[in-house]
Amino acid sequence: MEGPVKLILLDFDGTLADTRRANALAYAATLREAGYPLTEEEYLGRYFGVRCDEFLRSYGIDDPAERERLRLRKIELYPAFFDTVELNRPLWEFCRQFRRQGGRVWIVSTGSRANIDNAMAHLGIGGPETPEARCPAGRVDGILAGPDVARSKPAPDCFLEAMRREGVTPRETLIFEDSAVGLEAARASGAAYIRVTLPE
């Protein structure tokens, strides 16, 4: 990496927050309601980090209307499992310090905006619309969610779009990611990246 970092891009699920169990339980409950026998272990082993529509399609749900219905139902059920979500506090504190020194921080995720906003509110870290008075230094500068770009990870589009919106180059950007598809997207973006591994 050459020159100072001006922008940090964070994946959300599995990087900034450990949402593995909450996502697995919410998807399992959603699909069980619809008669599909997904287990928590199967979701975590094969699908965690994959955009919802792609996951449901690869799971064998071909009807787009049914996939959309299940996606919306999962968003409804997801907050019921937030007691299992944990903030990656060292990474969050690092990003807060980076922002205090003038850097910019975005969340760039394949997840839905509603899921990210709900989880951030639960964790007490707010989102870009949270007034500073209510959440001092606890904001991010932007959020790009799955539907905001045409091609999801492993394509680098989401990272490149966040850089474009901030007016920075890949050489001025640092990405934190956990999943194989996210790391592939980070590499393809041309930015420096750090792999995050959360404890089991």
Can you describe what each PLM-predicted range is?
Residues M1-K6, R96-R99, S112-E200:
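Asp-based, Mg2+/Mn2+-dependent phosphohydrolase catalytic module
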Residues Y36-L38, I61, I125, G167-V168:
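Helix N-cap/coil-helix junction residues
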